[in-house]
Amino acid sequence: LTLGQILAKERAVLYLNLESYSGFEELLGKKFPANLSDLFYYVRQGNENLIHRMNGMIQTVNNLDFIPPVRTPSDIRTVDWEDWERLLQEIVLHSSYEVLILDMGENGDEDFRLLEMCRKIYMPVLNDTLSVCKVTQFENLLRIWNKEKILEKTEKVHLPFHMDRISSDAYVEQLVWSELGDYIRELLRKERS
């Protein structure tokens, strides 16, 4: 979310939160009339005006466009690969967005296909024993499945903890100017040089 807001200052960015429990309605303090579940309904129907439908669902926070995430976990977990592929192709080929950010949770085997489509993958990691073991298991599975290309484009990031210093009423906007925002800007600066 912070990365998207920072990039959106210079480029057209669409943020898709694919987590089962995103907390977006609570975080932003409002209900959304349509969300990613509705968009996938149109994808499954083979709607020819998919980008037009999508544009009607777009919400914006701090210059960052996003489609509100699903409300129920099953809505994201039951999306077929063909539907993911069609949606992403439509966005890449027929929308005005230069950057598409997928904020992924844990949605099953489709995650690996989505990761294969990404140019860059940032993986937040922790240094505690259990977290390191989980990352190692993930990496080993990628090797077993011959998905080393995912590993090659993955950068592990140790994000600074930032929760305590940001007021709840403007949390999302304040992320950009938090310690996390500084960390992301430095990460992008290093990538560009």
What spans do the regions from the language model cover?
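Glycine-rich phosphate-binding P-loop
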Residues: 1-9
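A structural signal for short coil/turn segments at secondary-structure junctions
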Residues: 8-11, 95
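Phosphate-binding loop that captures ATP/GTP phosphates
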Residues: 10-66
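Conserved nucleotide-binding/hydrolysis micro-motifs of P-loop NTPases
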Residues: 20-22, 71-74, 107, 129
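Short, flexible/disordered intra-domain loops and linkers
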Residues: 27-28, 32-33, 75-78, 169-170
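Cytosolic-facing regulatory segments adjacent to core modules
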Residues: 46-60, 68-104
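Conserved catalytic-core segment of NTP-binding enzymes
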Residues: 86-178
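NTP-binding/hydrolysis catalytic cores, primarily Walker-type P-loop NTPases
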Residues: 170-193
